[in-house]
């Protein structure tokens, strides 16, 4: 499956000026793990629970053009990816510098 590189407008509006945005589903355990990872790093995230948002279905459809599964994480307005990319970035030591560059982490 080919994914779009550029987020659709509805996603760009939600991502806005927030350093870290996570699109999740409230019952997804992988989503919970990603949210806890960022919280454990001391990052204040903006979370959109797709199953609780009024425009959740539209958002989900737009996000599936970017990633095959939730959570879908944006750092500094750029798509980081889903749980696999987040964890790989964390394990490789690349996540913290990305968060610092985005202004989400100061230490």
Predicted features along the sequence, with ranges:
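Local sequence-structure signature of Cys/Sec-based thiol-disulfide redox active-site neighborhoods
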Residues: 4-48
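Ordered, helix-dominated protein-protein interaction surfaces in large eukaryotic regulatory proteins
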Residues: 30, 36-40, 61, 65, ...
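C-terminal alpha-helical interaction module
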Residues: 2-11, 16-17, 93, 99-107
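Short beta->alpha junction loops
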Residues: 49-54
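Structural motif
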Residues: 55-60
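Non-catalytic, surface beta->alpha helical segment in thiol-disulfide oxidoreductase systems
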Residues: 74-107
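Short secondary-structure boundary/capping segments
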Residues: 12-13, 71, 87
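Structural micro-motif
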Residues: 64-75
């Amino acid at each position: 499956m080919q994914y779009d590189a550029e987020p659709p407008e509805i996603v760009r509006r939600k991502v806005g000026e927030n350093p870290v945005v996570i699109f999740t589903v409230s019952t997804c355990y992988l989503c919970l793990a990603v949210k806890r990872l960022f919280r454990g790093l001391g990052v204040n995230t903006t979370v959109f629970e797709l199953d609780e948002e009024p425009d959740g279905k539209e958002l989900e459809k737009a996000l599936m053009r970017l990633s095959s599964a939730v959570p879908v994480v944006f750092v500094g307005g750029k798509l980081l990816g889903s749980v696999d990319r987040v964890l790989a970035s964390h394990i490789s030591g690349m996540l913290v510098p990305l968060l610092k560059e985005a202004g989400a982490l100061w230490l």
